[in-house]
Structure formats: structure tokens, C-alpha cells
Amino acid sequence: CGHAVLNYIIRDHDNYAFQNRKNHLVSIAEQLNAKWGAGTVELCITDQYYNMKEIIEQNIHLIENAKKACEKVGLIPNVSPIRGGTDGCHLSFRGLPCPDIGTGAHAYHGPYEHISAQSMDKVVDMVIELVKIYSTFSK
């Protein structure tokens, strides 16, 4: 008897759609087990990442100040949502909001992923500006 193991990562910007995607897999497993016999498909869903939008929205100053820091060093901020998958996601849900502020790299997670030394230098400048912004906040 053949055996196959499939691993999927399910992510979505919308929590409702995220749950629907998981429910869809459950439904498929139920249909296949009904057709081919119980145990034909074993499904184990383990949540690893959640959309950190809800955490970041409560701490929007993080995004606003990152945008200011970008502008101070001549970068044009490009704010776009990500679906999770970063250490910052885990930290955000543990009480330390950590939006992904980028690295200056291009073509992420593919064979052409790259970053120039100039881009790395510019990101360092941006982080220094961000630290300066937060250093003016009083506790």
C-alpha cells in the first residue's frame, strides 16, 4: 500500500479566511475518508503563525516611526502586509510587537534573492534614525 506525506503552510492576511482555509482541508479529508475508508487521510493541523496585524495596529507608532526613519535617509517607505512566518510574529504574540521593517533585499525566497552593499548600508542608516526617534520618547 502506498504512503504519502504532504506538508502545507497555510497563511492569510485575514483571520476569517485563514480559518476557512483550514476548514476546507478538514472537509477534503472527511470526503476522502468517506469515499476510501476511515484513516485513508490523516490530517494534523498545527498553527505556527498568526497574522500580526491585530498586534501591530495596537502599536501603529512602530510603522509610523519606521516610515519617518526611511524618509529621513531618503528611502520611500513601502508598507505592505505580510502573512507571518517571521520570528517577529512569534515575538509580537508574546507581547513584544515586531513588525518586519525590511532589509533592502530583493526577490525573497528564490534563486535570485539578493541585496547590495549599498542597500545594507542604507538600512543601517534607517535603523540608526529609528533609534534616534525612539530615544526622544520619555518613559
Regions found by a protein language model. Give the residues of each.
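Metal-dependent amide/peptide-bond hydrolase catalytic core
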Residues: 1-139
